[in-house]
Structure formats: C-alpha cells, structure tokens
C-alpha cells in the first residue's frame, strides 16, 4: 500500500516539473553568504541544493563571501580588523590574509562539500584568466557611524571594470560547477578585495544567467526589519529604487538590493533574496509556485 508520504513526494516532483523544463540548461548564479557559510547544516543543505540543480539539467555557478571568517583569522594572527562605515580597510598585510581565507579555506571547503554530495566543481578566483579585472577604488566617500561623511582610502579594495566570462563558460560547458572567490586583478597584477554580492551580480549579467540567488540571514526584503510578515514576495526594480530612496531599505541590505537591481537591468531574468538559514531554500524558491523569498524583476 502506498502511504501519504509517497503521495506527497510525487506531488512535489510533479509541481517541480514545469520549472525543471523551463530552466533546463540555464545558468543559475548562487551567492553563498550569511548562515549558509558558517552553519554546518546550512552549508550541507546549500551544497545539496546546488548539486541537485546540476543533476536536473541546470548550470549552477557559485560566488562566495567570507567577511566573518576573514575577521576571525585576523584576530588569531593578532591583527585587528579595521572598518570605516562598515567597509573593511584592506592594507597589504590584510590582503594576504584575505587571499588565504577566501581561496585557501572557504573556496576549498565549498568545493569539498559539493564533491561530497556528488557534484563536480572547480575552485577559482576572479584573478584566474583575468576573470574579473578591477581597479582600486581610491578615495571613497563613507558615512561614519557618527553620521559624518568621510573620504577614505580603503587600500586594496577594488571596483569591477570588466568580466571576462570565457573561463566560466568553459567550466559550465564541461559540466563543472565553478566556485568563485571574490578577488579581482588590476593592470599591474595586484590582487584586489571585491564585494562578493557585486561579483556575483556582474558575472551573472555577463554569462546571461537566468537567475541570481543571494543567500542572506533574513527571509527576503522586508518593509519592516522587525516583522518577518512584512516580506515582499515580488517587486520590480523601479519599485525597489523607491524603497531605497524612501529609507525603507537600509544598512547592509542596500548593496544586496542594488546588486539585484543592476543584475536584472543587465540581462539576468530574475534575482532572488533568500534566507540561507532555511534548509533547501534554493529548491523551495526555484521549484515551487510561490517561492519562499523575494523575487526581483524588471
């Protein structure tokens, strides 16, 4: 006799079928961040979701962050992390630690997790094959915690000039999942620290990704940060710009939202902000009618 659980599984598979067909052979950019980077269960769930996307015919691409781990490593080495207005100041010594943590630790851990769940992946950084060419930001206007606007030099912090997508295309065409550390390279061969959200959005646009998925520690875009029920399910880019202008979207959510806006306005079909703390959030967003996060479209 077939039990209810088996019926439920069949219903889930049938609901997923239209989306599997629609996104077959499409590139899906996933930005690993927040809880999905530090909690063992969340990391495992995210890796399984990513591998499943590959096995049902999609082409997942991963970009990861690593801010908290960088700060922890700096503390262990006796170097105090320095932030101005929430932005990391990256001197030469800090840059060496950033490279060590992003490429040598986090990237390899993600590749190992994907491999454990049956995924073929290759770890690279934005420096490889000049994937992400960048230049130093130089003097940057930063709003200090006391409200004062300062012009500061953040050191080896870069802005993206161009993305050369050939390496990513070569990997996805050969059935690998690229796992990308958010580093860039300048004209003099210097390594630059880049914002991981921005890297994910820029590469997603360049490779004509169907979706950009940003994993965070919030359910989605909230009109009231203290009320999960205020989450917006679907929103257009012009409406999002108004929410930023009106001060409804603030703080660390602004760069994530701006990344989604830029990606969608530059060729990505939809962008999604999801709660990486929720098991299988990627699958629930892609393969169900209503999803579980916020979807951004033009």
From Swiss-Prot:
One of its GO terms (molecular function) is ATP binding. GO terms for cellular component: cytoplasm. PANTHER family: N-ACETYLGLUTAMATE SYNTHASE, N-ACETYLGLUTAMATE SYNTHASE, MITOCHONDRIAL. It comes from Methanosphaera stadtmanae (strain ATCC 43021 / DSM 3091 / JCM 11832 / MCB-3). Substrate binds at residues 66-67, 88, 193. The keyword Kinase applies. The lineage of its organism: Archaea, Methanobacteriati, Methanobacteriota, Methanomada group, Methanobacteria. It is found in: Cytoplasm. It is an enzyme of class 2 (transferase). This is Acetylglutamate kinase. The record marks 31, 256 as: Transition state stabilizer. Pathway: Amino-acid biosynthesis; L-arginine biosynthesis; N(2)-acetyl-L-ornithine from L-glutamate: step 2/4. Its EC number is 2.7.2.8. GO terms for biological process: arginine biosynthetic process via ornithine; L-arginine biosynthetic process. The gene is argB.
């Amino acid at each position: 006799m077939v039990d209810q659980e088996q019926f439920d599984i069949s219903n889930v598979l049938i609901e997923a079928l239209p989306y599997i067909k629609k996104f077959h052979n499409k590139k899906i950019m996933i930005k690993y961040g927040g809880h999905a980077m530090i909690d063992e269960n969340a990391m495992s769930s995210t890796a399984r979701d990513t591998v499943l996307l590959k096995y049902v015919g999609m082409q997942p691409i991963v970009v990861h962050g690593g801010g908290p781990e960088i700060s922890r490593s700096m503390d262990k080495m006796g170097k105090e992390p320095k932030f101005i207005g929430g932005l990391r100041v990256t001197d030469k010594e800090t840059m060496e630690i950033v490279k060590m943590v992003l490429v040598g630790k986090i990237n390899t851990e993600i590749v190992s997790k994907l491999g454990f769940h049956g995924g073929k992946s290759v770890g690279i950084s934005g420096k490889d094959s000049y994937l992400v060419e960048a230049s130093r930001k130089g003097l940057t206007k930063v709003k200090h915690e006391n409200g004062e606007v300062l012009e500061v030099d953040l050191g080896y912090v870069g802005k993206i000039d161009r993305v050369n997508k050939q390496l990513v295309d070569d990997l996805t065409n050969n059935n690998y999942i690229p796992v990308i550390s958010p580093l860039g390279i300048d004209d003099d061969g210097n390594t630059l620290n880049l914002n991981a959200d921005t890297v994910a959005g820029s590469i997603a646009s360049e490779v004509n990704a169907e979706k950009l998925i940003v994993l965070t520690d919030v359910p989605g875009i909230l009109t009231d940060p203290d009320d999960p029920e205020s989450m917006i399910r679907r929103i257009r880019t012009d409406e999002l710009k108004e929410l930023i202008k009106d001060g409804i979207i603030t703080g660390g959510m602004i760069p994530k939202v701006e990344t989604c806006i830029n990606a969608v306005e530059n060729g990505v079909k939809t962008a999604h902000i999801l709660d990486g703390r929720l098991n299988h959030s990627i699958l629930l967003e892609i393969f169900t009618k209503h999803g579980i996060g916020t979807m951004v479209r033009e």
